[in-house]
Amino acid sequence: SRGLGDVYKRQVFNLWAMMYEEGEYTIRHSHFPSDFSAVYYVDVEPGCAPVLFEVPQNDGVNHKCETFTLQPQNGMLAIWPAILHHEVPPTKGRRMCISMNIDKGERK
């Protein structure tokens, strides 16, 4: 069987570092039109805020979302579809992370 890496040459288009101090947050957003988003947690303190993802639960009639919570840990790498909306509520502990957008790129 072939995986995504066998068919596409992946490319990181944006890469940025973020440092959250106590009380800082990020508003709800997505990284569309990228294919995937990722974050690597370099250094997080106890009490740092989680990432809250909105996962669509569309039944064809109602447009509902379920919230998925990701609690950062030192050395954690998280990758998700860039179309998912997410936010970071005000943090109580410092966190340093590197975020990026990943695109499938051109077919091999």
Where are the predicted features?
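Short, small-residue-biased leader/transition segments that mark boundaries at the very start
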Residues: 1-8
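Catalytic core of non-heme Fe(II) oxygenases with the double-stranded beta-helix
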Residues: 10-79, 83, 89-90, 95-97, ...
